[in-house]
Swiss-Prot record:
Pfam families recorded: Toxin_3
Record's protein name: Toxin Boma6c
Function, as annotated: Alpha toxins bind voltage-independently at site-3 of sodium channels (Nav) and inhibit the inactivation of the activated channels, thereby blocking neuronal transmission.
Molecular function (Gene Ontology), one example: toxin activity
Gene Ontology CC: one annotated term: extracellular region
Domain LCN-type CS-alpha/beta: 2-64
InterPro entries: LCN-type_CS_alpha_beta_dom, Scorpion_toxin-like, Scorpion_toxin-like_sf, Scorpion_toxinL, Scorpion_toxinL/defensin
One of the protein's GO biological processes: defense response
Subcellular location, record wording: Secreted
Amino acid sequence: VRDAYIAQNYNCVYTCFKDAHCNDLCTKNGASSGYCQWAGKYGNACWCYALPDNVPIRIPGKCHRK
């Protein structure tokens, strides 16, 4: 498990405005909790605590949105 920005397909973060949205997203993916980090490295993005290793996280490199 790790603490990280949860990622969508193509290495893109989940943007957010409310902590509750991120907490729900993170816990549904097996994390202990999560919150919306404002003005972070990737803008306003969901950060998860104790996210399982099988869930994708944001890694260095570009977000490749289609």
